[in-house]
Amino acid sequence: MALITRRRFAWQTAFAAALFGCPLRALGSRGVSDADKQNGAPLDAEAIRKLASHIDGNVITPETSEYDAARSIFNRAFDRHPAVIVRCAGPSDVARTLEFAQTKHLPLAVRAGGHSRLGFGMCDGGVVIDLSAMKRVEVDTGKRVARAEAGALVRDLDTATQRFGLATTSGGCPTVGIAGLTLGGGEGRLMEKYGAACDNLLSAQVVTVDGRQVEASPKSNPDLFWAIRGGGGNFGVVTTLEYQLHPVDQVLSGALTYPPGRIPDLLQAFVKFLAGAPDEMDAFAQLLPSEQGRRLKIDVCYCGDPRLGNDLLRPLRAFKPQDDSVKTMSYLEAQTAGGFLAAPVAHFQTNLLLRELSGAAIAAITTAINDAPATCKAIIVPLRGAVSRVNVTDTAFALREPGYEIDIAGVWNTPAAKAEVVRWVQATRDNLQPFGHGVYVNQLGDTSDQLVRSGYGPNYARLVEIKKKYDPNNVLRLNQNIKPDSASNT
């Protein structure tokens, strides 16, 4: 069955209802989570028909052949069944879908790239605003500005801007959506030089829960602009983002992979290397399983003169990596090389922030990785350079203190493996907690009020007040949620 447009939907819904002898209600209620449950009105054929008649995009229900593909998200640990998915064609579709979900008292999810660690882009038994068809990117080379629709992926933004030798901080995985990335802060290979993705956001078009289409910028709704630069999708549905671009052409990029057995020495060398590295140097370390034992891999991307970049890498190459793939390439090539998870898979990931990689912290990390299941890893992301020179209260994104983000993750394909992975990830986080002081909300595979507060630190109280203004009923709650009725103390 084809996707449902407003023209085709009237007869399709009537036929389906007659055939199955039942209303087209929230069939996705199978497996509804406690967080998603609401006493919503059933979605019968007439309700869906009326919705489709006002939508320029496509309306997808459990009866359409595209339903399973449309509800599929990157983290296959979540298998959610929404009652209806609205693949929006523009802001007006977003506004109409927001109104529909609230009128029917149904849970509402917003999907752009579909990479949420907690599967927030889908919900059980509710309504999904799907932005994936809105992915146009326009580049103004004179102003060095990109204007991108919220369904664009990192690869869409990079491909459009690299045609002109330009780029902005946009994450390290090509299939991540730029909207979720940016709204949560946005780490990437250029953050040491040019700041986080949210630091390069010039303005955004937002549909508020009451259906208004507004601009968020330093001059228009500045409180909203402050909040969406790190505060996630708590305040409205962003439909367009405008970014500052920078000249980025050739980079020195690749990885140094070392033999097993030298993780503590290599991490100490990594810390020393970073201390003398300029802002042009992005580097992160991965602690990986292998048949020979745990090993360390250092990924680098240097956006300055490649000859100088090679000179800077001499201390790391002195440890004789068994594989050295670092070479000069286009920034686009570096960006499309892949990320931690190259393909959709069931996974669990969490993180914490460390102010330093002390000897004790390195020992704890080494012990953890030596005990890790074969499908688990840890990633050490330095927080330094331009991203750490922004005042913590200038944006909602609070990761401004120099230090390290430790991402702890694992994948599985059986229930037994899942239990082992989750147990190790949680135990590793707990063991590193004495060295930690916060979290990055975009990389959390679990959620709680305490974790959300920890992610926003001194900005939490202001975020609560802005949430009360723009979404007092917490319609947009399937996210790392800032509750409007939260006590504002941190």
Model-derived segments and their meaning:
Residues 2-490:
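Soluble FAD-dependent oxygen oxidases
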